[in-house]
């Protein structure tokens, strides 16, 4: 992918080259997007809309850290949807990881989570945030133990993993495909900024419906699909049950009972 590559920390120039090589990113001065490596982190900027600021992964401070400490633990909807209220801590494959917030929440509750992110720029941001979290004194130990990142298209990854004899199928496959957001729906400033940048960078997941079938084949216990409250079922397939929050819905496709049931 073509993108501007900017290094603001001269001593990290080689590191930026390695990031570009690993995620097959090519430098281009014509792109409106830039990956910027600073002293602190890797961030994405939309240069033609500087007021949007930088997008980066941060699990140590801010909203994600607050949710880990005060977010309701295993009583929150995502935990119930994944089956944590059954007395188990399932192995989860997050097949549309994005900035990793939901993966981090599940891992903070004890799950082992393997993340898949199909877009190379987002995956690079995710890897940078993961590495910084691993170095944190408070959360580094369990982040290192429970969270890993695989880079591939979600569709290909699910099929590749299903055919890999060395891969242990996850208990839960989690899907949160990007969905167009109506302008009349209220959004927080942060979500509005991220969605605006991501939808112009990545586009909507027009092939998201095709994720459900391979997810159902790969998961041992259930598939959980996060949807906006106004969105139809993924692939027009009715879930076994649904859990609703103020703005979202978790559609749960049950394959087998969780071991605690």
Swiss-Prot record:
Where does it reside?
A: Cytoplasm
* Keywords, ordered alphabetically: Cytoplasm, Methyltransferase, rRNA processing, S-adenosyl-L-methionine, Transferase
Which terms in the GO cellular component ontology are assigned?
cytoplasm
Mind telling me which SUPFAM superfamilies this protein's record contains? S-adenosyl-L-methionine-dependent methyltransferases
Cite the EC number: 2.1.1.242
User: One matching Pfam family, short form?
Assistant: SAM_MT
Q: Its principal location? A: cytoplasm
Family of this protein: Belongs to the methyltransferase superfamily. RsmJ family.
Entry protein name: Ribosomal RNA small subunit methyltransferase J
Classification from the root reads: Bacteria, Pseudomonadati, Pseudomonadota, Gammaproteobacteria, Vibrionales
Q: Which gene encodes it?
A: rsmJ
């Amino acid at each position: 992918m073509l993108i501007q590559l900017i290094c603001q920390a001269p001593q990290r120039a080689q590191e930026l080259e390695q990031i570009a090589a690993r995620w097959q990113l090519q430098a281009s001065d014509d792109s409106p997007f830039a990956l910027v490596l600073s002293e602190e982190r890797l961030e994405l900027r939309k240069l033609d809309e500087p007021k949007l600021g930088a997008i980066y992964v941060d699990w140590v401070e801010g909203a994600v850290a607050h949710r880990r400490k005060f977010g309701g633990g295993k009583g929150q909807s995502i935990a119930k949807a994944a089956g944590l209220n059954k007395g188990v801590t399932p192995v989860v494959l997050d097949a549309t990881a994005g900035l990793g917030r939901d993966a981090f929440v599940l891992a903070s509750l004890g799950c082992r989570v393997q993340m898949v992110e199909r877009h190379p720029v987002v995956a690079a941001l995710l890897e940078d945030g993961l590495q910084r979290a691993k170095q944190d004194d408070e959360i580094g130990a369990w982040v290192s133990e429970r969270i890993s990142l695989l880079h591939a298209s979600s569709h290909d990854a699910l099929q590749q993993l299903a055919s890999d004899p060395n891969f242990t199928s996850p208990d839960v496959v989690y899907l949160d495909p990007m969905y167009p957001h109506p302008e009349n729906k209220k959004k927080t400033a942060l979500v509005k900024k991220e969605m605006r940048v991501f939808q112009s960078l990545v586009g909507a997941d027009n092939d998201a419906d095709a994720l459900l079938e391979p997810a159902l084949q790969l998961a041992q216990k259930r598939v959980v699909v996060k949807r906006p409250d106004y969105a139809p079922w993924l692939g027009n397939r009715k879930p076994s049950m649904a859990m609703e929050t103020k703005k979202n819905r978790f559609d749960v496709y049950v394959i087998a009972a969780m071991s605690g049931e």
